[in-house]
Amino acid sequence: MAERTIETELSAECLPKHVAVIMDGNGRWAKAKGKARVFGHKAGVEAVRKSVTTANRLGVKVLTLFAFSSENWRRPEDEVSLLMELFMTVLTREVKRLHKNNIQLRIIGDKSGFSERLQRKIATSEALTANNTGLVLNIAANYGGQWDILQATKKLAVQIAEQGLTASDITEDMLSAGMSTADLPDVDLMIRTSGECRISNFMLWQAAYAELYFTEQHWPDFDEESFANAIAWYINRERRFGCTGEQIQALIQE
């Protein structure tokens, strides 16, 4: 029997299948540099690229990024407008790169809250990458965990009415089937940047058994090494291999 090294163990069994990230700290990062908040949001786009690239190279199956919560509409109107334009620009610029790298893009959340122009761009971007078989990249936009559970419950209510089901017929799997990530594995590792230790209504159903990783780094500073350290922390929590961030980075380079 071939010797099983830590590298084969990591690549075969131990990596999280689904990583979710609350990308926090763009505004604080910008403020520390004496810049407007939008400067931080734009800098955060590069951190997104690095995380997507790292997850894809490692063989993570699903990466879900919390880009815009249902509560973010309460921010100043000019900031929300800039965020929507940035979303449109990034979709236009990045989708071809994602497609080239066999990444499937999905936007999860209440898309009806966006402009028709942005909804069309989302639809065309998702259609372009729909048949890709690599990393599934979920961008959670106008998303909230409570919203997700509510919309799944409404779907289930229709099913109950149509099929004449009773309360005893209802199962967790039936509710799970209506969630925005129904065909994907639940979250194994949830990362939050910028020092806040809460999950802020993000993937409440899917992250029921996730490991929660909090880092003081603001999102624009979260790079390949940061991602590798989070993965190493998860592996040590799950498997107790004594894995290091450097070993994870070595896997990325293979």
From Swiss-Prot:
A Gene Ontology BP annotation from the UniProt entry: peptidoglycan biosynthetic process
Subunit structure: Homodimer.
Lineage: Bacteria, Pseudomonadati, Pseudomonadota, Gammaproteobacteria, Vibrionales
CDD domains named in the record: Cis_IPPS
GO MF entry, a single one: magnesium ion binding
Name of this chain's protein: Ditrans,polycis-undecaprenyl-diphosphate synthase ((2E,6E)-farnesyl-diphosphate specific)
GO terms for cellular component: cytosol
Binding site for substrate: 25-29, 37, 41, 69-71, 73, 75, 192, 198-200
Disulfide bonds: none
Cofactor comment: Binds 2 magnesium ions per subunit.
Binding site for Mg(2+): D24, E211
